[in-house]
Amino acid sequence: CTSLDCAELGGDSAGCNAPTGRSTSCRTISGSSACYLSCGQDSDCRAGYDCIGAGTGDGYCGTAGQTSPTAPTAPDTGGGINVVCQSTSISGGRALTFDIAASSVAFAVVPYSQADLVAPSRLLLPNGQVGANFATDHAFMTVNAGILQTVAPVVFPAAPQFQNIVQQGGGRYTLEINTSDDSPCYYVLQKSVEGSKIDMNIYLVGVNGITAANAAQNAGMRTMLDTMRRIYSKEGVTIRTVRYFDVSGTDRERYRIVRNINDCYGLVSLSRAPGPTLAEKLSVNVFLIQGFQVAEAEGLLGLSLGAPGVPGVHGNEGAGLVFTSEYLSSRADMTGQTLAHEVGHFLGLRHTTEHGGTEADPIQDTPVCSNPDRGTSCPDATNFMFPFSLGNTQEGISDGQGFVLRRTLLTQ
């Protein structure tokens, strides 16, 4: 996600602006760091919100089931996406086997369940050795278990130092997952060359004065896209095709102002494959709304429903990203940075440093900040994947980040 840096704007020591007589805390919920109102009981929260953790001394106002989107719909088959619903029982879950070609430079596995939670455990190489352990060297990839819960897309290699995973000469791999569902499904996508082009489907959700018919000519939209192009082109990646769609009727009225983070799941579920071919399906769904008014996540600018998101399959809770058009007319360049940031998440990039400085991305050539609340003084503050929008130019990108962008299955 991207948030305004409250500390840079004069917030309290936690980086949050608390209402008079109330306290707030910065928390990571569903993979997103944001400010939440503290509480001791449900009555401390506004209508429609509960005190999560009431009685523990560390409660916060949120929605019941905040991290529990509904089970994904079954993906449409065909067009190069082959869904398999066969697996082997192992202790604590299931083992999914699949073949990867010797020529592949990257692959994605997307396990999902209609009945239970799904979380990756280990990836076994063709020789039986552990190529990725999601409790240790690949722990950064478990974020989707908290965001999506019932679907867990994983991409390999997730950073340059993990190239050996795809340098095995091809063969049969096994992804072990934790789940109580005895019949989970999955699909596998792989590519034999690096990609350089990204296709996007931009859904306009009540954005003032902009429709699918005039979006391509809108000055703010052009500046926004040019900013993203400028960032990504430094690593040989560009935007190829942009398709525009209007979200209309009751859906527009329901989602144009997002007041509940959970609504983002329903919003991206409105996406549809732009065409029947795999090339058309391998596109990024972007939902541009009027704005966020989430009291418990003040300053939120954008949110990706997955890191990485669900590749190639549309119409589900992990099929896109949402960001605000609030600054499109006044700061289209900053909106473009937000777009580049959220697309980066959807393609598999993490924040250079997470809030509080306790975690960082796995990419070895991105700087790390001991406390991102320091804002502009952080060594990674100018990187486009810094967790806060600081209101200045944040267009830096590293070679390691470019490595990930070129290998994602959504870059063709």
Region annotations inferred by a language model:
Residues 1-77:
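Secreted, cysteine-rich disulfide-bonded mini-domains of extracellular proteins
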Residues 63-98:
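Non-catalytic extracellular/lumenal accessory regions of secreted precursors
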Residues 100-108:
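Extended extracellular/luminal ectodomain segments enriched in beta-structured repeat modules
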Residues 252, 326-403:
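The catalytic-center signature of Zn2+-dependent metalloproteases
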